Amino acid sequence: MVRYLGPHVKVIRKLGSLRAFTKKKIKRYFKLDTKKRKLSFNKKTSKYKIRLKEKQKLRFNFAISEKQLFNYVKKAIKLKGSSGENLLVALEMRLDNIVYRLGLAPTIISSRQLINHGHIYVDGKVVNIPSFKCKPTNNIKIKDNLVSKRIIEKNIELLDKYFRAPSHLYFNKKKLEAKVINMVKREDIKLIINELLIIEFYSRKV
């Protein structure tokens, strides 16, 4: 994805909280102009806009391009089971998201930088592809050098109160080692989103 360089607050003001995209928060307020308020209540949000918003939430949260998301949707539809759940699982099992969910980086963009710079090993080999698909039994380690360990340890210290490894992941903080225990389950995906609306958004294009 071409990295989004615009104001992050503007994005979450439109789409809502996206913790993997930014830790920034917004203060919500209501305008006192009653006429404008009445007009806003009378406006009906189209089904297209609702689906578009859900799609954008997913795209920004996982920091992927429109083309990448479309490809994930096409693959998800071909698999057995719920297409929406297949889509979320595929994105959740990306290496950049796994590194983020372990609390090794504050956002997915940050975890992607760690991966690109060779700080992350999978099954004993350096993996510098953020979209690498993790699977059960994969062992994830931090590169055994002082620079890598300092970066990760600093992130863990800052993020420890915000992150707990989900049930499909195991993380040993002392050894800086993690393991993928099983595929992520829908209930372990923290992003508040209606994935079926995203499948509907792309249904005519697939």
Swiss-Prot record:
This is Small ribosomal subunit protein uS4c. CDD domains: S4. It is found in: Plastid. GO terms for biological process: ribosomal small subunit biogenesis; translation. Part of the 30S ribosomal subunit. Contacts protein S5. The interaction surface between S4 and S5 is involved in control of translational fidelity. One of its GO terms (molecular function) is rRNA binding. Residues 93-161 form the S4 RNA-binding domain. It holds the Pfam family Ribosomal_S4. The keyword Glycoprotein does not apply. Transmembrane segments: none annotated. One of its GO terms (cellular component) is plastid. Keywords: Plastid, Ribonucleoprotein, Ribosomal protein, RNA-binding, rRNA-binding. One of the primary rRNA binding proteins, it binds directly to 16S rRNA where it nucleates assembly of the body of the 30S subunit. With S5 and S12 plays an important role in translational accuracy.
